[in-house]
Amino acid sequence: MTDQSGQRRVVIVGGGFAGLFAVRALRRSASVTLIDRAQHHVFQPLLYQCSTGIMSEGKIAAPLRDLLKKHKNVDCVMAEVSDFDVEGRRVIARRIGGKLIEFGYDDLIVAAGVRQSYFGHPEFARWAPGMKTISDALSIRRRVYGAFEMADTATDPEERRTYLTFALVGAGPTGVELAGQLREVATKTLRAEFRNIKPEDARVLLFDGGSAPLAMFGPKLSQKAASALDKLGVEQHMGSIVTHVDEGWILVRDHDGAETRYDVGTTLWTAGVEAPPIAKVLATATGAQQDRAGRILVEKNLTIPDHPEISVLGDMMSLDELPGVAEVAMQSGLYAGQRIRHRVSGKIEEKPFRYRDLGSAAYISRGKAVVSVGPLQVNGFLGWWIWLFIHIAFLTGVRNRIGALFTWWFAFTRDIRRERTFTTQQIETLRDVYTLPLGPDTATAALEPATGRHAATPETETGATPAAPQGHANVPSDPVQAAGKPQKTAE
């Protein structure tokens, strides 16, 4: 089947790295419809810099239409996919305003990414936001700087100490990077700006169920990271599991089973991810299997078994325990796009997807980062420069790269974080509705008939939230307070 121009129809769900690289690989060999519920592509590895005031959202995100304006074969659609008609080869999505529209396809690529996982406790999200979207980063920015403002006007010493205590759940790259940035905000950026408080007295608590931060980087770099965090003043609580999150406090169980309450003004969740609800919808429609995190199990060519026309890419796919990093998304997108292009040109033979590990990098603080590339392990100042180069190279758009360089120069040489504007009304802003579990209360009713090239379809039902993974290292699958366990309050 083809569209009116005679080209093969390809629908891509998701405008992240996987979706964009698939678009670029297809070139002009197909008519492409790219569907995303946001109208921008965001560089997620730098979201923590947006949340701590270094970067503006415009420097780490770019409009999809602008990025793809030279790709005349690509139509960008802002809508949220809600269902798949596999037999009829249709994608059903909800447009702005609530009406459903459909898109026919010959090949379907689903690269919808992942969302924050609370391991069976979505109620934690209200008091412990994750960081997967621009909305998340801006909400965290308001919470962080708002905490210092609230502490400045607090008259009760205990209340002031609570506002100046920050907890991070999860000591992977995002948790470590955020922890380091929060201490730099307190000890450098804000140090001379307040008269009633000492921002440098702010406590940053880092919790993880594992034995060390950045464990995935290996023992050597993990120890270097732990040492750098110690020097920054980050209080590391390894072997600790957060069992409850509420307004103003968290409950933590250590490796001995003792539970401790910590009074905290801000809790940030960086402990894990899971596939979005649309993965369950796709699995139900195709009969595909899902792993513990809800990701779709795919064949070696990244397609769903018995459905060679449907590819699942990036963080949403499950194959050979590949990590959820940008390089996997990029390479899988390039592979899937080339595979479809080869099929269009009549090339039948195809090779299985092979991931080339380009290494990992994590920023800790100014002049300190860890980088692991195969047998090469670098830390400290050299690692920091390598980190800068990698992230500049991966940023989308020349303007964003140049802007990032100037922003980093000001931030790193003059302790300036210009992106700190917010109002009192914004301090308590809750997280974006898309980051919360989908359900009847978040669904939008259809309001008006759709117009234009996309036909309206009857209302469809989104799938249930995928089952939470069990036995995660940072947070238990069922973190309930154990009866009879000793409980204490942190000093």
Annotated model-derived regions:
Residues 1-7, 74-167, 257, 268:
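FAD-binding core/adjacent interface of flavoenzyme oxidoreductases
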Residues 2-78, 82-83, 166, 173-217, ...:
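Beta1-alpha1 glycine-rich phosphate/pyrophosphate-binding loop at the start
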Residues 6, 332, 338-491:
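C-terminal, flexible cofactor-proximal segment of oxidoreductases
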Residues 18, 113-116, 179, 273-275:
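Short glycine-rich anion-binding loops that position phosphate/pyrophosphate groups of nucleotides
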Residues 41-44, 117-120, 276-278:
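Short acidic/His/Gly/Ser-rich catalytic and metal-binding motifs that mark active-site loops
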Residues 71-90, 183-300, 306, 348:
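A Rossmann-like FAD-binding core segment of flavoenzymes
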Residues 127-155, 249, 261-332:
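FAD-site-proximal beta/loop scaffold in flavoenzymes
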